[in-house]
Amino acid sequence: MRTRIKVCGFTREDQLAQAARLGVDAVGLVFYPPSPRNVSIEQAQALCRSVPPFVTAVGLFVDATEEQVREVLRQVPLTLLQFHGDETPAYCQQFGLPYIKAVRVKPGLDLLQYATDFASARGLLLDAYVAGVPGGTGERFDWTLIPANLPLPVVLSGGLDPDNVTEAINNVRPWAVDVSSGVEQGKGNKDLAKMAAFIDGVRNADV
């Protein structure tokens, strides 16, 4: 199976276009003001103009109000939503777009029950648990905590980079991988060489 690749946290149009040319499957835009990768609606509109056909534009939200999400959707052509907070299944379903739900994995968390609760999601994005931080920490978690029989596609995140993504895929065999800080020079500033090396690492695992 070919592992899908999402790069999250774009803030520059040229870097998003470079990622698309390298072959990523999805690009993530962050709508969460505390994040250094947060983009305004105007920035997001410009970034989406660099998204070619068949590349998914993903909007990331963290405990946003319903109106905040709808305001973005009225103006930005997103095709998938990603929720990173304490959103309920009913909340996530109400926007009429497919969504993935992020889970901060730690010992004792029942991922099978979580997948049952969020059966309407297109997948679960598994990230590292860091107290008080909703994601984008650059920390990895214990992959053995992932049940082999999860009923939803797994999007593996959390501390992935060009040096460990091949190992991660060989261990977990996820549907997709998600990276942000692992391919950056600084927060929100993507590194072309790191993105290319990350994609090569994914392809090496898929052979």
Task: State each model region's role.
Residues 1-207:
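Conserved N-terminal beta1-alpha1 strand-loop-helix module at the mouth
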